[in-house]
Amino acid sequence: MEEEKKKSRVLIIGATGRLGNYLTRFSIESGHPTFALIRNTTLSDKLKSLSDAGVTLLKGSLEDEGSLAEAVSKVDVVISAIPSKHVLDQKLLVRVIKQAGSIKRFIPAEYGANPDKTQVSDLDHDFYSKKSEIRHMIESEGIPYTYICCGLFMRVLLPSLVQPGLQSPPTDKVTVFGDGNVKAVFVNDVDVAAFTIKTIDDPRTLNKTLYLSPPGNICSMNDLVELWEGKIEKKLEKTFATENQLLKKIKETPYPDNMEMVFIYSVFIKGDHTYFDIESCGGVNGTELYPDVKYMTVSEFLDTLL
């Protein structure tokens, strides 16, 4: 009976990043023996804080097979939270996990739109195809997995009310992309971490994609504008930008400066977060599985911008 209750041992890769730090803390708070792979053993304030919380720090990197193998041998679950630009650096990790043969679950660095469902492959400079490549490698190697798809972090697009180039929401005029009715999903990164840690020992999420689509966080541009107008008690002057106008702007703007607009095109024109049904494509809904997890709503996030 005691063995059944034993919590999985967890290795976090990318523990000093924003999401990785949240993941590490929730893992420890949930009672999982937690390890963090770190490049430098010199204790920064962040690392000291993790160590003081009970995290075991292991020196190593995604390029060093020996250190990876040693770290993987100590745990049951591996969670990667490395930045998207380094996503292909997980290839050696996948091979090491395969060779170890003892990992019960691998959660790769995704935490966005489902890369196999997005419709912007000609625009995104392989942003999503690299994530798909890691997925297909995991599955072809027969590694147990859970993928976390959370739409967009709230700190992406929302602080400007989806106005490219702005750092804060508009107070007079707003540009609405498309007809303004296509819905996107936004989740705060600390909440993404909380849901992710919940999946670790849950058989319902094994070899599944966990979608986070919290009620109150699925919003169209028209919804966002209406919410914001209510908070500032003022109507904004709306201008509508067509799909072709947005595409033209994306193509005229050099990479990576155009990626903000690529995300806007993906979610508010193509509907890449919401055009498919979660259950019918084999996914599971995080807010239904874990109704106890409290999360920030879009309205609450907009309150922080006032």
From Swiss-Prot:
Keywords: NADP, Oxidoreductase. GO terms for biological process: positive regulation of leaf senescence; response to hydroperoxide. CDD domains: PCBER_SDR_a. It is an enzyme of class 1 (oxidoreductase). The keyword Transmembrane helix does not apply. The active site is at K131 (proton acceptor). NADP(+) binds at G14, A15, T16, G17, R18, L19, G20, R39, K46, R135. One of its GO terms (molecular function) is pinoresinol reductase activity. The keyword Disulfide bond does not apply. Its EC number is 1.23.1.-. Gene3D superfamilies: NAD(P)-binding Rossmann-like Domain (3.40.50.720), UDP-galactose 4-epimerase, domain 1 (3.90.25.10). Pfam families: NmrA. It comes from the Eukaryota. InterPro entries: NAD(P)-bd_dom_sf, NmrA-like, NmrA-type/Isoflavone_red_sf, PCBER-like. Probable reductase that might be involved in the reduction of lariciresinol into secoisolariciresinol. In most plant species, a single enzyme is able to reduce both pinoresinol and lariciresinol efficiently while in Arabidopsis, PRR1 and PRR2 show a strict substrate selectivity for pinoresinol. PANTHER family: PINORESINOL REDUCTASE-RELATED, PINORESINOL-LARICIRESINOL REDUCTASE 3-RELATED. Dimer. Belongs to the NmrA-type oxidoreductase family. Isoflavone reductase subfamily. This is Probable pinoresinol-lariciresinol reductase 3. It comes from Arabidopsis thaliana. The lineage of its organism: Eukaryota, Viridiplantae, Streptophyta, Embryophyta, Tracheophyta.
